[in-house]
């Protein structure tokens, strides 16, 4: 009887134990929460308030990685400047690249902007392609499916729960996408300038034309010569919108706005990056609200 009682305790502990999931960025946490629900405990490594390329590798992140059963990253080199040293020091074999607990969501994305050559002369380029694919709401679908698949592998006991949560989430997301896509139709063929090539996936999805960038090259601060050239291009092309992210300096965009009459629109790069974008739906909705109204 004692052995049976102990076995019941162990079995109950296993059923109630949560999967510790570490994610590199908030949008991944928002998706994982929808799939994992009460069976996962999620910790976010990077803040939406800062440049995703440069997360400060604080010691507190080591303990989070050390305890993780699963690590979900954006991939495509976005975490290359800060995550590898932390992974090495965390010494957690469960979440190393190639293991079941390591999830690189870029692997299920049709990448764009792949450079034909990799050189510092071209700025801060990503060999695998543009890593900012989360700006396209349609990319949420394959990412959610991958996360669910990996959760099933890490925690097979709750396999049916994850599958059910995924189905419910996708049904809701398809409804959201239908409405969102309809709103975006009025923005087709709009011409914009962006600070960084942050919104390319979003722009490509909805037929919006990026005429240029405030950065002369990725990761390179704008020069006076490049800024004047961009102003002239915007006047020639009739560009009336400048897309500004929350973490780059805004002085240059405001200067260009005064010279061209274009309005500066600050769009979030991640869930929670600006006020009122704490959910996946609100994160994307603000794109349509700011651009197409």
What do these predicted regions represent?
Residues 17-293:
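Extracytoplasmic metal-acquisition and chelation regions
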Residues 4-15:
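Sec-dependent N-terminal signal peptides
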């Amino acid at each position: 009887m004692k052995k049976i009682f102990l076995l019941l305790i162990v079995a109950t502990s296993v059923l109630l134990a949560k999967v510790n999931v570490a994610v590199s960025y908030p949008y991944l946490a928002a998706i994982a929460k929808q799939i994992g629900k009460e069976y996962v405990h999620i910790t976010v490594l990077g803040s939406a308030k800062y440049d995703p390329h440069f997360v400060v590798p604080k010691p507190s992140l080591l303990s989070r990685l050390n305890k993780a059963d699963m690590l979900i990253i954006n991939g495509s080199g976005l975490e290359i400047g800060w995550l590898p040293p932390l992974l090495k020091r965390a010494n957690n074999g469960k979440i190393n690249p190639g293991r079941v607990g390591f999830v690189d969501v870029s692997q299920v994305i049709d990448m764009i902007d792949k450079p034909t050559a990799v050189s510092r002369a071209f700025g801060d380029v990503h060999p695998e392609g543009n890593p900012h694919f989360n700006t396209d709401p349609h990319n949420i679908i394959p990412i959610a499916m991958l996360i669910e698949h990996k959760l099933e592998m890490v925690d097979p006991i709750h396999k049916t729960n994850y599958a059910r949560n995924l189905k419910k989430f996708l049904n809701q997301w398809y409804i959201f996408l239908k409405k969102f896509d309809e709103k975006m139709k009025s923005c087709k063929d709009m011409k914009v300038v962006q600070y960084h090539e942050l919104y390319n996936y979003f722009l490509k999805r909805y037929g919006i034309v990026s005429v240029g960038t405030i950065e002369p090259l990725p990761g390179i601060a704008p020069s006076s010569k490049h800024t004047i050239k961009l102003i002239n291009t915007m006047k020639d092309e009739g560009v009336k919108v400048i897309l500004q992210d929350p973490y780059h300096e805004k002085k240059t965009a405001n200067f260009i706005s005064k010279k061209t009459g274009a309005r500066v629109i600050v769009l979030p790069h991640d869930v929670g990056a600006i006020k009122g974008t704490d959910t996946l739906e609100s994160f994307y909705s603000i794109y349509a609200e700011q651009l197409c109204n």
